[in-house]
Amino acid sequence: MLLFLLRRIFDCRYKYKLFVKALVLFLTIVYNAGLVHFFFRTTSLDDSPEMNHVDYVAHVIVMPIVLSIGMINQCLNVCTLLHIRTSIFLYLKASAIADILSIVAFIPFLFRHAKLIDPSWELGMFYHAHLELPLINALISASALNIVAMTVDRYVSVCHPIKFFQNNETKPSRRRTMLIIVMIYFIALMIYFPSVFQKKLGVVTDALTNKTIYTIVRNEDVEALQVFKFYLIVRECICRWGPVLLLVILNMCVVRGLRKIDKRNWFWRQPSQNSRTETLAQRQLRSPRDDRSRISVLLFVTSATFIICNIPASVISFFVRRVSGSLFWQIFRAIANLLQVTSYLYNFYLYALCSSEYRHAFLRLFGCRSSLSPTSTGDSPTVRVSVHGKRCHQAVVLLGNENHENPVDEV
């Protein structure tokens, strides 16, 4: 039934409107379920039962549902991308794999908030204190940085096609892409390595059972260092604000480049003034032009959703010391964390919106379409762009885009 509905949406003329409406409706339901009513219901700023209730609803009830749906979407995403041979899609594959790994890394995080862990297990508590959040945030950052790398590649192919092809001729595209992906994963892990020392284990002995219990506390000595404060600023710029600014700026440049390409192609294919009939070139160009207009809107929507999902987490990182004793900041933190994990939900659908090649690969995955490669259209990830001069140079332009997620802050 789900595959039938997806196929009907793919064949719908105004499919992007249906996807946007469904996305907005789903996000509205998720955010209102167990979160918004707390903001209007509670007024105390230091009420431990209420804060525990907020934490339980956000991280034990709502977040597992979101992550479960996100895992299904990301698995479908990876399986679909495996059927696409284009080297540029390696960035999307690497991003989706990082998302799957981060969802798996979220499982101990959820167990800890559900109080399903043994606080007397030293090795387990050591992982929760030192490795849990840095690993999650590093994987989320790797996913976001892969999208940034893909966007940079797309920007060069659209705005500087000759230089793009010169680079592809001198260096193998697939090998270069794999090297960049490995470097991105390594850089993301190195960026969050100092965060390992941000928390430490506290030891408490139960007087009744004489049992040692380990607790997670903030390492105030490390956080007070000026070097560590400078590191936090650099980390936020690289992993949060940097990807946001780059995606917005580069996507705007890509949209402008696509419009220029559309105007140039339309000018060169104009019929004579005496011709009253529509030429074959016009009929072939009209559909890609409409598709590129739709892609321009989608690029704007995806950039806006990327900012909405990640800016709250960036704000909470600057007020981390106020979170533990304030109900308002606990609610804000819960909403920020949920906003970030919702990015796992919609990127699969945005890929399907932006790329007909992706849709064809998804349908071939379930045997709904023949294995023949589809003809590239205006919304396909590979579009032939004519550069008029002495000769027509052709550039491969990636038109797909998605939002990703940035690191989660938790105190």
Curated annotation (Swiss-Prot):
CDD domains: 7tmA_FMRFamide_R-like
Residue ranges crossing the lipid bilayer per the database entry: 19-39, 56-76, 88-108, 132-152, 177-197, 230-250, 300-320, 334-354
Principal location: membrane
Domain of life per record: Eukaryota
Keywords: Cell membrane, G-protein coupled receptor, Glycoprotein, Membrane, Receptor, Transducer, Transmembrane, Transmembrane helix
Side Cytoplasmic, residues: 1-18, 77-87, 153-176, 251-299, 355-411
Single GO term (MF): G protein-coupled receptor activity
Annotated localization: Cell membrane
SUPFAM superfamilies: Family A G protein-coupled receptor-like
Membrane topology, as annotated: Multi-pass membrane protein
UniProt GO cellular component terms: plasma membrane
InterPro entries found in the cross-reference section: GPCR-like, GPCR_Rhodpsn, GPCR_Rhodpsn_7TM
PROSITE patterns hit by this protein: G_PROTEIN_RECEP_F1_1, G_PROTEIN_RECEP_F1_2
PANTHER family in alphabetical order: G-PROTEIN COUPLED RECEPTOR AH9.1-RELATED, G-PROTEIN COUPLED RECEPTOR B0563.6-LIKE PROTEIN-RELATED
Family, similarity comment: Belongs to the G-protein coupled receptor 1 family.
Summary of the function given for this chain in its UniProt record: Not known. Putative receptor.
Full protein name: Probable G-protein coupled receptor AH9.1
Species this chain originates from: Caenorhabditis elegans
